[in-house]
């Protein structure tokens, strides 16, 4: 444990950014950008974020652009690290067999040279939306329908999670059964959401063929307009059980528990127990699903073909 903390603290506090090494990594990232530019799934995802949050940090690609990567300097990388990697913005998460007092003492000793950085104000993300189409000589069409969703603090957060699972997660979901199994309009379809501290998005992804797109879109919209109260108590109970299994399985993994604790503290300023999450999921009722549907599914904002 002591060696691990020593290595992490050294990386965070005393890293050097040699220009030659930076150029090597620059080349790797440029190749990665080129690789993703050839993947329709990646194009759709990046363009969706860009349209959802234009000219905002939330809408920018994690990889960056080729222009930025080519021009960034060692000083800029070091400045970024000193500005953002500071104690005010960090959580040190430990999970497993350890002595708490010893860990606290080690962290206090080893991280004394962390830069204090700035309390930069990051404005609240503002969802906008739009439309993007890209023609490519491919057999497949990737389509993403996105909506402004709820943030992680919303009263409808848990209901939205359950609704999304019932709607489009797995082979028993409504979208899979109605659109793939019954009509054969897609080879892949699912719904999901991204939940942040100040914003959220809800979306449906579909992979299909050129000939099926025209029929797919109205059928998909019809499914999204169906009242969520048409789900049964049995379906709701099974979905809740699915969440519980996922949570309990995650608890068996030390690394998963470590990441979960860190994320929970960053988002909620406390570590939430699995029992708390399960209790919230259990409290979701059928009428809550319709509230979640109405809140998340409003207007069609993005249609991407690649």
Question: Each PLM stretch: what is its role?
Answer:
Residues 4, 166-185:
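M16/MPP (pitrilysin/insulinase) zinc-metallopeptidase core fold and M16-derived inactive scaffolds
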Residues 1-118, 133, 150-151, 181-306:
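Charge-rich, well-structured scaffold segments of protease-associated domains
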Residues 117-174, 303-305:
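His/Glu-based metal-binding/catalytic segments typifying zinc-dependent metallopeptidases
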């Amino acid at each position: 444990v002591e060696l691990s903390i020593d290595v992490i603290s050294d990386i965070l506090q005393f890293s050097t950014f040699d220009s030659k090494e930076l150029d090597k990594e620059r080349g790797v990232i440029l190749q990665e950008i080129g690789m993703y530019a050839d993947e329709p799934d990646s194009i759709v995802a990046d363009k969706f974020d860009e349209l959802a949050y234009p000219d905002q940090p939330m809408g920018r690609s994690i990889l960056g652009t080729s222009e930025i990567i080519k021009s960034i300097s060692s000083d800029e990388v070091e400045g970024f690290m000193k500005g953002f990697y500071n104690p005010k913005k960090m959580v040190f998460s430990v999970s497993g067999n350890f002595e708490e007092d010893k860990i606290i003492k080690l962290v206090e000793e080893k991280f004394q040279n962390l830069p204090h950085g700035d309390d930069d104000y990051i404005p609240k993300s503002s969802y906008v939306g739009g439309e993007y189409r890209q023609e490519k000589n491919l057999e497949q069409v990737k389509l993403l329908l996105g909506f402004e969703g709820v943030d992680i603090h919303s009263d409808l957060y848990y209901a939205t999670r359950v609704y999304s699972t019932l709607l489009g997660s797995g082979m028993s979901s409504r979208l899979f059964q109605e659109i793939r199994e019954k009509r054969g309009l897609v080879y892949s379809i699912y719904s999901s959401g991204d939940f942040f501290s100040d914003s959220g998005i809800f979306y449906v992804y579909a992979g299909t063929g050129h000939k099926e797109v025209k029929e797919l879109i109205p059928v998909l919209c019809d499914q999204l307009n169906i009242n969520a109260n048409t789900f049964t108590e049995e379906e709701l109970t099974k979905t809740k059980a699915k969440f519980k299994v996922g949570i309990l399985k995650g608890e068996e993994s030390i690394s998963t528990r470590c990441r979960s604790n860190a994320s929970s503290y960053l988002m909620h300023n406390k570590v939430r127990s699995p029992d708390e999450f399960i209790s919230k999921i259990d409290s979701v009722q059928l009428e809550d699903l319709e509230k979640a549907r109405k809140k998340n599914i409003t207007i069609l904002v993005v249609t991407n073909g690649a």
